[in-house]
């Protein structure tokens, strides 16, 4: 990263071009202004930060506009769209099974959400971080990889996506969206379902934090680990709680179907499990996921690094 004090030192010496090493790459930043660095405008400052001074002004304008924090709507739309498709598959499998008896087996119904999450992470992970789950947003913020100020917007976008998917399914399939919600098994208890959701979400968020942390970061291929975990957890744990691991995945169909039976299980379990996963990550790796953790949590738009010094 090219720091402004370094730019000032070279600029004050009368030079018009600055070379700096960034991640073993040489970046040339041309100073167009002859006045003090403190007088450069926001766009020029952003260009210096991104090492874009050698590019044409039109290109710089497009890139800095895309990185402008005012463009938060890109992230929010990504969360809305990703959650929509997640709930479309997760709730849709059960609703299809209810409408067309025997058309979808349990294994297919619980594995499909994992595959969809994998696809959505590969598709939109670089835009928003591909949370699609308030428990994930909460965990990233708690660990310091994601700004708390963005959490409410993400949760609202996720909720709207879940409700839209549930409403679409109910209108198209013709059965109540409550058929696609999660409930404790009749042969079990709400407490057992709560404990199952807690443990399953603890594992899920641990996988997410682990694949997004410093030396453990494996980039967008972390989608394979996350999607596989969701599918495997659903295959063996769904008979007790439905293996939701996501408060919004359950709340969307609950709202449309107007049935909130034992919803506390699917709110408290995942959030507590996510918090425990952050504690486990702290024990295993220390505080924060570093630059890689921030990039994974926030996507590649304007990113605020909480711990840029952490490898």
Regions found by a protein language model. Give the residues of each.
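RNase H catalytic domain
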Residues: 3-47
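Membrane-interface helix-loop junctions and terminal tails of multi-pass membrane proteins
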Residues: 34, 39-311
């Amino acid at each position: 990263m090219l720091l402004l004090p370094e730019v000032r030192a070279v600029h004050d010496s009368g030079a018009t071009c600055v070379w700096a090493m960034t991640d073993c790459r040489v970046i040339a930043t041309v100073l167009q202004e002859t006045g003090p660095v403190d007088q450069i405008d926001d766009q020029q400052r952003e260009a210096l930060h991104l090492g874009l001074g050698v590019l044409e002004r039109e290109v710089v304008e497009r890139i800095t506009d895309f990185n402008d924090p005012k463009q938060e709507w890109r992230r929010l739309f990504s969360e809305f769209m990703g959650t929509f498709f997640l709930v479309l598959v997760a709730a849709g499998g059960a609703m299809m099974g209810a409408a067309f008896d025997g058309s979808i087996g349990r294994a297919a119904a619980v594995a499909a959400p994992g595959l969809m999450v994998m696809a959505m992470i590969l598709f939109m992970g670089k835009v928003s971080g591909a949370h699609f789950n308030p428990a994930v947003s909460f965990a990233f913020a708690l660990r310091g990889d994601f700004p708390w100020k963005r959490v409410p917007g993400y949760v609202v976008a996720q909720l709207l996506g879940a409700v839209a998917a549930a409403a679409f399914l109910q209108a198209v399939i013709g059965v109540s969206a409550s058929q696609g919600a999660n409930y404790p098994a009749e042969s079990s208890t709400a407490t057992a379902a709560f404990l199952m959701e807690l443990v399953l979400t603890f594992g899920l968020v641990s996988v997410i934090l682990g694949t997004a942390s410093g030396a453990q970061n494996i980039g967008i291929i972390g989608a394979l680990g996350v999607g596989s975990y969701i599918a495997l957890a659903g295959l063996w744990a769904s008979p007790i709680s439905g293996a939701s691991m996501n408060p919004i995945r359950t709340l969307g169909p609950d709202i449309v179907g107007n049935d909130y039976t034992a919803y506390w299980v699917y709110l408290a379990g995942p959030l507590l499990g996510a918090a425990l996963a952050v504690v486990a990550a702290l024990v295993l790796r220390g505080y924060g996921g570093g630059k890689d953790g921030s990039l994974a949590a926030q996507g590649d738009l304007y990113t605020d690094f909480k711990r840029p010094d952490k490898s």
